[in-house]
Amino acid sequence: MLFRGTSLAYSLLVISFLTPRSSAGQNCLTKSLEDVVIDIQSSLSKGIRGNEPIHLATQEDCIGACCSTKDIAGDKACNLMIFDTRKTDRQPNCYLFFCPSEDACPLKPAKGLVTYRLIRDFPLTSANSSLQQLTQGEFLLLDHSSPGATPGFRTPAGYPKPTGLSWSDRSSLKSTAPLHLRKHIKADETSMQLPEEKSHSQSLQLPSELKMAHLLPKTVPTPPTTVAVAPLRNVSATLKPELLLTSISVTAKTLKQKEATTASPVTTVTSKLPGVPGSTSFTPVVTHQAALTNTFQAHTDSKGILETMPFQGGSTLTSDPRHGKSSTSESSITNKTASWEDRRVSVGSASLNKGPKSQHGLSFEKWLLIGTLLCGVLFLVIGLVLLGRMLVEALRRKRYSRLDYLINGIYVDI
């Protein structure tokens, strides 16, 4: 009985002695780095501090001592320790240090040494802080991409408003986010606003189209002669004589395209009014476009060869509105295009006729230049021949006869 009580007391004493060490070891998170040691020479200049080495039996005891030590260099807590497994009994093998940052304590390889870093008390480096900021930014982006936290998106009428973060919460999150994340958020907001503007513009265009659809049936019952003749009179008044270019054939294609494009909205209007034929409303639109294109080409196309052309195609449009307006308008347009093509062919043939004349004039000038050059060369050769002959005669020695000598002797005697 006494032996049991003594053993129980010893066990309680051992448990009470080991409890603080185990709790200290559990509270300290460590990172083990084997076979490395601190470069003391370069670390001293960066602020590393340490205590005197002590002897401990195991590495766990050294970790516990580092966790409980908070008086390095006065008030610094231990956050880095080195345990030397090569030391024998009674020799100091546990080294406790305070390191300001990871960069301040560079490591170098060393066999038999184990280095431990306390993660709990170790200061955060720039890499860790940037990683933390990145995770915060990703959280902001994820929160911003949710429909409740999107400030630039407006819900249409009749739909429930999304619930989520308030405006103040979003503004506070934006203020804490990094600069590049703010730019990314702004880009998302603008991309969300663009579909809204497009839908708004489409909604504005729809009432205007409806208004035009309501206005067009009112003008359909009126006689088409008044609508078609008015722009034609204006054109004939402003174009006397009308000036057209060789490039008018291009406008004929645009007339056909405009005819095809203007036909579709008018047919939709006439579908609502079954009593009104679609051809009567189609004719003034086409003639109006043709008149506009004629005036536009006359005023803008001011370059090139201008020729006069009488105005045609007005009489066919003033016929009876009950019979084939679309066919008469198409025939007038085809007549115009045919006349324009004839004009283009005539202008092209005139330009082709002028081409040989210009080539003939060029060849005449060429031969004239060659003849002038040959005459100059000929005169140069003649001049050189005469000059050479004079030089030869001057250098050639004359042969004197007896009479010449006699005369010279007489003159000498005199």
UniProtKB/Swiss-Prot annotation:
Residues 393-414 are cytoplasmic. Its main location: membrane. PROSITE patterns: MANSC (PS50986). Residues 32-116 form the MANSC domain. The chain crosses the membrane at residues 370-392. GO terms for cellular component: membrane. InterPro entries: MANSC_dom (IPR013980), MANSC_N (IPR011106). Residues 25-369 are extracellular. Pfam families: MANEC. This is MANSC domain-containing protein 1. It comes from Mus musculus. The lineage of its organism: Eukaryota, Metazoa, Chordata, Craniata, Vertebrata.
